[in-house]
Each structure stands twice: as structure tokens, then as C-alpha cells.
């Protein structure tokens, strides 16, 4: 009986440690998602009227999952401390929802990468052509693109040189830069999503083991 209670206590503390880590991970995920969505150059691009909102769906899901992770981390600590099967069962269900959300984020980031790249490239080409037709019409949009991706023009930068960053050294094709930068960012989002999903699996295992151990301890008593 003493060994059984010792094992139960060990599992409980493991779950408490997991929930602390999970809470911290949730905070990091929220900070990461908000910085990616509203920080720096991405903020400038997202302010455009033609901004592809679906491009940010993965980030919205990531931030929402991060907030849920923080709440669930606290919820799981309460369940472990009180040794409540009901609370632990609810905790497992919440982890399952977070797992699904994070997997969705990761899959969307990897699979939707090509669509997002093509959409932003099309936006740039439209702004580029508008500028060539009317130097005032697409001026602001083109400046935003060039500043965001630190590039200038397509095959040549001579026709759009006034809209290019002054600090830019040499010529960088915007079509290529858009593909490179968006690909890297979405891969990072996907890796974070899948990584958190993997962490969630351990939480589900710990919660179920503790729940079963609590039930068995009560049966023994």
C-alpha cells in the first residue's frame, strides 16, 4: 500500500511539473503568435486592404490554443492536487482539443504554404503593375511590400527604384524574396504547432495514468 501511494504521489508531481511547463509554453505560444501577427514588417503588410486574412488563420489558432493552454495548465494543477477524477477527465478532454488545434495549425502551415505564397506574389504583381500604369496609384502598397520583404522590383529594379528601401544593397527580386520569407515563417509556425501537439500527448498520458491510479487506490481502500 505504501509503494502504491508513493507511486501515486510520484505521478501527481510529474503531472504538476508538466502543467507548469504547459502553462509556460502557453505563454510563449501567445507571445510568439502575437509577435508574428502584429510585430515588425508583417504588421505593415497586414494593414493593406488586400491583406490575405486566411494567411493568418494558423496564427489565430495558435494564439487561441496558447490561451487555452494557460487556462488548462492551471486547471490541471487543481485536478492533480485534489486528486479529482472528474477534473482530470475534463483536463484530458481539454488537452485533446488543444492537440487537435495545434495539429491543425501545423498542417495548415505546411500544406497552405504554397497557396499563401502565390496569393502574396499576386498581390505584389498587381501593385507593381498599378504603379507602372499610374505612379501615384500603387505607390504606398509597393513601398510597403519593398520595406516588408527588403526587396526591389522583379527582374529589374530600375522602373520602381523610387519605392525601394534606401538602405537596400544590390537588387533582390521580390517574387523570390516573398517565397523565401513566407516559406520560412510558415515552417516555423508549423514546427511550433506540431511541437506543442507532441508535448500535449505526454499530458494526456500523465492525466489518464493518474486518474486510473486514483481509482485503483480508492478500490483498494
From Swiss-Prot:
Organism domain of life: Eukaryota
Residue numbers on the Cytoplasmic membrane side: 1-13, 76-90, 210-221
PROSITE patterns: TM4_1 (PS00421)
Gene this protein is translated from: TSPAN2
Protein name in the entry: Tetraspanin-2
Phylogenetic classification of the source organism: Eukaryota, Metazoa, Chordata, Craniata, Vertebrata
Gene Ontology, cellular component aspect: membrane; myelin sheath; nucleoplasm; plasma membrane
Similarity comment: family membership: Belongs to the tetraspanin (TM4SF) family.
Topological category with respect to the lipid bilayer: Multi-pass membrane protein
Subcellular location as annotated: Membrane
Annotated transmembrane regions: 14-34, 55-75, 91-111, 189-209
GO BP terms in the entry: astrocyte development; axon development; inflammatory response; microglia development; myelination; oligodendrocyte differentiation
Sequence ranges on the Extracellular membrane side: 35-54, 112-188
Main location: membrane
Glycosylation sites: 139
Function, in words: May play a role in signalling in oligodendrocytes in the early stages of their terminal differentiation into myelin-forming glia and may also function in stabilizing the mature sheath.
The entry's keywords: Glycoprotein, Membrane, Transmembrane, Transmembrane helix
Pfam families registered for this protein in UniProt: Tetraspanin (PF00335)
Amino acid at each position: 500500500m505504501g509503494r502504491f501511494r508513493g507511486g501515486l504521489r510520484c505521478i501527481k508531481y510529474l503531472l504538476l511539473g508538466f502543467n507548469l511547463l504547459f502553462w509556460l509554453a502557453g505563454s510563449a505560444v501567445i507571445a510568439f503568435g502575437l509577435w508574428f501577427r502584429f510585430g515588425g514588417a508583417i504588421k505593415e503588410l497586414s494593414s493593406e486592404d488586400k491583406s490575405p486574412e486566411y494567411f493568418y488563420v494558423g496564427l489565430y489558432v495558435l494564439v487561441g490554443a496558447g490561451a487555452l493552454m494557460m487556462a488548462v495548465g492551471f486547471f490541471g494543477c487543481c485536478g492533480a492536487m485534489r486528486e479529482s477524477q472528474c477534473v482530470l477527465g475534463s483536463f484530458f478532454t481539454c488537452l485533446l482539443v488543444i492537440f487537435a488545434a495545434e495539429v491543425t495549425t501545423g498542417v495548415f502551415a505546411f500544406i497552405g504554404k504554397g497557396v499563401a505564397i502565390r496569393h502574396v506574389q499576386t498581390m505584389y504583381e498587381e501593385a507593381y503593375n498599378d504603379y507602372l500604369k499610374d505612379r501615384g496609384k500603387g505607390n504606398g502598397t509597393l513601398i510597403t511590400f519593398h520595406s516588408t520583404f527588403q526587396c526591389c522590383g522583379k527582374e529589374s529594379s530600375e522602373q520602381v527604384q523610387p519605392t525601394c528601401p534606401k538602405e537596400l544593397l544590390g537588387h533582390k527580386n521580390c517574387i523570390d524574396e516573398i517565397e523565401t520569407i513566407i516559406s520560412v515563417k510558415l515552417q516555423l509556425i508549423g514546427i511550433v504547432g506540431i511541437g506543442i501537439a507532441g508535448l500535449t500527448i505526454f499530458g494526456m498520458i500523465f492525466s489518464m495514468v493518474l486518474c486510473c491510479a486514483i481509482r485503483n487506490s480508492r478500490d483498494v481502500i
